[in-house]
A protein has these predicted regions:
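Non-transmembrane alpha-helical segments in soluble domains
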Residues: 177, 186-193, 222, 226, ...
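Hinge/lid segment of periplasmic solute-binding proteins
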Residues: 111-173, 254-257
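C-terminal capping/gating helix-and-loop segments adjacent to ligand/active sites or protein-protein/ligand interfaces
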Residues: 66, 301-349
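Conserved N-terminal structural module of periplasmic/extracytoplasmic solute-binding proteins
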Residues: 1-115
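Extracytoplasmic/periplasmic substrate-recognition and gating elements
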Residues: 246-308
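Loop/turn elements at helix/coil->beta-strand transitions in domains of secreted/extracellular proteins
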Residues: 48, 82-85, 104-107, 160, ...
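Extracytoplasmic ligand-binding clamshell segments of periplasmic binding protein
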Residues: 93-96, 192-254
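Structural recognition of the beta-strand scaffold that forms the well-ordered cores
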Residues: 88, 107-111, 163-165, 172-175, ...
Length: 349
C-alpha cells in the first residue's frame, strides 16, 4: 500500500469513527421529536390578541347586514391567524359618536361618508390592498399593481389617502302606478333634479306636490308611503326592500321603482385608526384586502349594494337595482368625499 492509499484509508477510517460516535446522538434527537405535533402547531404570529372593528351604520342595504358580511370576513382572517381575534361591532352613528367622545376608537372602522374628518385615521400607503400571499388585490384589466380604481380618490383627505370605499347604495323613486304612471314619474324626477334638489335631502320632502302636464302628484315621506299615503316617495334600497317584503305579506299596496338619479351620498368607507399598533397591521391589511377582493365584493350584490371593485361580478336579483347601479357606475367619479361628504360633518374627537 503506497502513501496515497494509506492517506485515503486513514480519512475513511476517521469518517467511519465519527459516524459511529454521532449517529446515536442524532438518531436520539429525531426519535425524541414529535413531528405530528410540530405539524399541527401553528406558526408563531407577530401579533396575538384582539383587533376591534366598528361598522358605523349610516344606511342599510336592500336586505341583510353589512355587519354580518364583515363578520364572515373576520372569521376567515381568524382561521388564518392563530391567536388573533376580530371583534366586529355594528353601531349607529349616534352610538359611535358617543364612544368617540368618550375617548374610544377601534383599530378598524367602517363608516359612512362625512362621519369622520380624516385626522383620526392612519395614512394608507397601498400596503392595505395586499392579501395573505403578498399579491395585490385584483381590480381587473387596466389596473397595475397597487393602482386604485377610478373613484377611490374619494377616500383622500387633501393629498393623503386615509380611507377606501368598499360599498355604495342608491336613491330610488317608489310610486303607486295606479296614481302615477312610469312616464309621469320620469317627468317628475326630471323636474326634481333640474331644480337643483340635492341627493342628500331627496327623502326629506314636503307634501306640496309636483305638477306635470297630466296633473299634480303628492310626494310623501318613506314612512307615510309605506302606509299607502301620497303618490310617490324618494328612498333608498332598504326602503324598496321593506316595501317589497310588506307587499309580499299583503301589508302594502303594489308599487313600482325607478332610479332617482346617477348620484348617491350612500358610500361606506374603511379606515385604520392612527393609534393602531404596528404589529396589528399585517392582519388588518389582509382583512381589508379580503374586503376589497372581487369574490367578497361580489357578495355585496346579494345585499343590494354596489361593489367598488370593478372586477367584481355585478349581478342583482332586482332589475331596478341593476339599472340604478348602472347609472351610478357611469358617474363613479362623483362619489362624495369620505370626510367632506353630504352626511353631517364632524370635528375631530
Amino acid at each position: 500500500m503506497n502513501g496515497f492509499q494509506k492517506t485515503i484509508a486513514a480519512v475513511l477510517l476517521a469518517a467511519v469513527l465519527l459516524f459511529m460516535i454521532y449517529l446515536p446522538k442524532c438518531a436520539g434527537k429525531m426519535l425524541e421529536r414529535d413531528q405530528y405535533r410540530e405539524w399541527l402547531e401553528p406558526e408563531e404570529e407577530e401579533f396575538s390578541g384582539v383587533i376591534n372593528v366598528w361598522h358605523v351604520v349610516g344606511f342599510k342595504p336592500y336586505m341583510g347586514s353589512v355587519g354580518a358580511w364583515l363578520k364572515k370576513i373576520a372569521d376567515r382572517a381568524e382561521r388564518r391567524h392563530f391567536g388573533v381575534y376580530f371583534e366586529v361591532e355594528s353601531i349607529s352613528e349616534a352610538e359611535a359618536e358617543a364612544k368617540l367622545q368618550n375617548g374610544e376608537f377601534p383599530d378598524v372602522i367602517s363608516f359612512p361618508a362625512g362621519f369622520l374628518n380624516g385626522r383620526e385615521l392612519r395614512i394608507m400607503n397601498g400596503t392595505e390592498i395586499f392579501g395573505i400571499d403578498g399579491t395585490v388585490v385584483d381590480f381587473g384589466d387596466g389596473y397595475g399593481a397597487g393602482e386604485l380604481p377610478a373613484g377611490f380618490d374619494c377616500g383622500m383627505d387633501g393629498r393623503t389617502l386615509r380611507a377606501l370605499p368598499f360599498a355604495a347604495g342608491c336613491k330610488l323613486a317608489l310610486f303607486y302606478p295606479e296614481r302615477v304612471t312610469a312616464a309621469e314619474m320620469t317627468e317628475i324626477l326630471k323636474h326634481i333634479t333640474e331644480n337643483g334638489e340635492s341627493k342628500a335631502d331627496a327623502d326629506s320632502c314636503s307634501n306640496d306636490g309636483f305638477g306635470t302636464e297630466a296633473g299634480k302628484f303628492e310626494r310623501s315621506s318613506v314612512d307615510e308611503f309605506k302606509k299607502g299615503k301620497g303618490d310617490f316617495c324618494i328612498g333608498d334600497a332598504r326602503a324598496a326592500g321593506d316595501m317589497e317584503r310588506l307587499a309580499a305579506a299583503n301589508k302594502a299596496k303594489y308599487f313600482e321603482v325607478l332610479p332617482f338619479c346617477n348620484e348617491t351620498d350612500e358610500v361606506q368607507f374603511v379606515g385604520i385608526s392612527a393609534k393602531t399598533e404596528r404589529e396589528k397591521m399585517g392582519c388588518i391589511s389582509e382583512f381589508i384586502a379580503d374586503m376589497l377582493s372581487a369574490a367578497r365584493q361580489s357578495e355585496l350584490c346579494t345585499l343590494g349594494l354596489m361593489p367598488m371593485n370593478p372586477a367584481a361580478e355585478k349581478k342583482f336579483e332586482q332589475s331596478f337595482l341593476t339599472e340604478a347601479y348602472g347609472l351610478l357606475s357611469e358617474s363613479i367619479l362623483n362619489l362624495p368625499n369620505a370626510f367632506t361628504g353630504a352626511a353631517a360633518r364632524r370635528a375631530a374627537f
